[in-house]
């Protein structure tokens, strides 16, 4: 739980192997967090040495994004390990390839179920706990891919659009409870998950996303972009006529 001056002490990472998620956790540990729970399918073993080297107590629990009926139990297990959850980072998901999804509609539906449905069940489970505590922040990794969906990744982008809208609505539902939601909209981030994707303009590293999240938590922002230049860029992109939009590449 938070210490006497309100600093973050405990962090739960849903998607315990996510490179962006782990960068956020490491940043929070460097800033004083001391209890970390990494939630991933089959658990995370071994836990990242960088976190323990910084003095954090790191725990691992099983979490399957495709099994929404287990998500409340995962949150409860994390609470049993570290008590109140100061920050929960919602970082799980799958990217895949648009062409493969078009060839296999069932695979596309499974990906959408994880990238949207999994976040709905996990987000509601976390929100219930934060509301009960009366404090805490849920950090939701959305994407600029969901700001205006593009043809080259519309299965992934449409799920992110749904997630972004859900996170905003969840934030409004928590207003006045002491708990809050921070929506994070990164652009292209080179990670293992995106290794097959051609680089896009204005990339960000996992560390830069973590820095934006840290700043957003300190300022009690509701939304952060990484990098910040993407905010005005995508504000303008919303106005591009659809006849032109469909012809644009990355």
Give the positions of each predicted feature:
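Rossmann-fold cofactor-recognition segment
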Residues: 51-69
